[in-house]
């Protein structure tokens, strides 16, 4: 047995990030880039009304749009068998505003027409201003520009059980003209398309989904905005789909998105993580038409770190599994069956977006831990402003690794499928590294030397 001694390098310490985006800051940032007068895309139409308006836990018929209310039973704190249909973009389903809790037990809400803002009475179902809304056994469909099926905002809680939510936007897949105001379509760096999101949680609110289906035609199924402190989306045993384009979930700074035992079928990404937020996925079955995850940051602070945990489940993607663009991340992959058609497991690159968050001094970098798994795919680090730190813990990795600092525990092995270049941290037995004939594994270590590997490749140690 031959042991190789690694370099004694230390990963930079994580620094505290204090940046919290308010709605006003987000609006100002986007308007600074757009021509013409300032535009508040958060603001709903002031003329909008909901078929069922609830104020401080009480049904308010005088504030409701009776013409859109086709049927249902109103009780204390509850509406049952609600039927709503409207097509003017200004009339919504259920609007719960203020303190108190309201329950919808059975609903069929069908809305169409172009909408303004995020939330507001024209939404399929919305809770705001400190309220709680519980929805059971509902079908909510919203069609039209920026027409949301559900929204939770301004310190509220939404819980959805055994329901189907969908949004369709306006046509965009065949070259149709698209709106040009800020945030009526996704920012180009997201590499997606569409003009409506099915659900959004924002401004210190929480949303929980159970045994439900969330479908977006384009842009997004589950989205977050402007946390102003803390935002949470949690989906349990759900099906999350984007049909033509878009992501299943977005993590804005200060936001937390957790998918447990979900089936995700996304036209583009399963999730996009922007800035300092958390994305956790446990025992999910995921298929993506582009990348599995995109991690990036704009308008942010250099200290921001994205926290990503993928535990169990199965992930398949057409594009590189994980794309990291000028981003500090803390990524844990644990016991996950993950593969990409491109053969690339993780690719980190420099973000050419002029709005990309600056790098700062001693950046935390890209920290990846792979635990209790067998994985195939290349890991390629080409962001020259940050370093990658790869830890293998009871893991077998088959693929090239380039540009990373690598640490092994005694139960881990690496089979390099093509020429690789890494820096070794700690000590490793030569028998833990292998490569086929014709492949050279270059390791920057605490010593120099050359070893023939078991499958015919060569291990070159350089200082």
Describe each region flagged by the PLM.
Residues 39, 43, 54-55, 102-106, ...:
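Long, compositionally biased, intrinsically disordered segments
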Residues 4-6, 22-113, 458-463:
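N-terminal segments that cap or nucleate solenoid repeat domains
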Residues 9-16, 34-45, 53-61, 96-98, ...:
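Mature extracytoplasmic/periplasmic regions of secreted or cell-envelope proteins
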Residues 54, 59, 74-81, 101-106, ...:
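All-beta strand scaffolds that present successive hydrophobic residues in beta-strands
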Residues 83-133, 137-142, 148-152, 158-162, ...:
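Extracellular beta-helix/beta-solenoid repeat scaffolds
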């Amino acid at each position: 047995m031959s042991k190789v001694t690694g370099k004694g390098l230390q990963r930079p310490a994580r620094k505290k990030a204090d940046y919290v985006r308010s709605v006003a800051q987000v609006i100002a940032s986007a308007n600074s880039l757009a021509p013409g007068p300032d535009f508040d895309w958060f603001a709903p139409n002031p003329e909008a009304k909901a078929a069922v308006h609830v104020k401080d836990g009480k049904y308010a018929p005088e504030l409701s749009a009776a013409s859109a209310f086709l049927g249902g039973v109103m009780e204390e704190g509850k509406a049952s068998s609600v039927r709503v249909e409207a097509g003017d973009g200004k009339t919504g389903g259920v609007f719960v505003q203020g303190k108190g809790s309201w329950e919808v037990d059975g609903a069929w809400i069908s809305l169409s027409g172009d909408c303004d803002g995020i939330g507001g009475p024209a939404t399929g179902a919305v809770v705001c201003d400190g309220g709680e809304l519980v929805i059971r056994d509902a079908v909510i469909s919203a069609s039209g520009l920026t027409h949301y099926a559900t929204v939770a905002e301004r310190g509220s809680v939404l819980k959805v059980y055994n329901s189907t939510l969908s949004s369709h936007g306006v046509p965009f897949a065949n070259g149709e003209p698209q709106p040009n105001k800020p945030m009526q379509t996704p920012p180009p760096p997201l590499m997606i398309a569409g003009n409506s999101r099915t659900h959004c949680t924002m401004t210190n609110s929480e949303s929980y989904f159970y045994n439900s289906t969330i479908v977006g035609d384009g842009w997004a199924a589950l989205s977050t905005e402007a946390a102003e402190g803390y935002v949470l989306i949690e989906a349990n045993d759900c099906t999350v789909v984007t049909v033509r384009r878009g992501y299943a979930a977005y993590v804005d700074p200060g936001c937390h998105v957790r998918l447990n035992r979900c089936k995700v079928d996304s036209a583009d990404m399963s999730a996009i993580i922007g800035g300092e937020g958390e994305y956790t996925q446990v025992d999910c079955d995921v298929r993506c038409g582009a990348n599995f995850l995109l991690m990036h940051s704009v308008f942010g602070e250099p200290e921001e770190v994205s926290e990503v945990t993928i535990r169990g489940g199965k992930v398949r993607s057409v594009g590189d599994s994980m794309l990291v663009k000028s981003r500090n991340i803390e990524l844990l992959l644990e016991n996950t069956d993950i593969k990409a058609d491109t053969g690339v497991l993780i690719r980190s690159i420099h973000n050419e977006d002029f709005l990309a968050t600056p790098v700062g001094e001693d950046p935390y970098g890209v920290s990846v831990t792979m635990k209790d798994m067998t994985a195939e795919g290349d890991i390629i680090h080409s962001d020259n402003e940050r370093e990658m730190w790869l830890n293998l813990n009871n893991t077998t990795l088959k693929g090239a690794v380039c540009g990373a600092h690598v640490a092994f525990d005694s139960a881990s092995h690496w089979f390099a499928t093509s020429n690789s270049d890494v820096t070794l941290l700690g000590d490793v037995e030569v028998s833990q590294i292998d490569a086929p004939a014709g492949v050279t594994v270059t390791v920057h270590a605490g010593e120099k030397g050359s070893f023939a590997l078991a499958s015919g490749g060569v291990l070159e140690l350089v200082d």
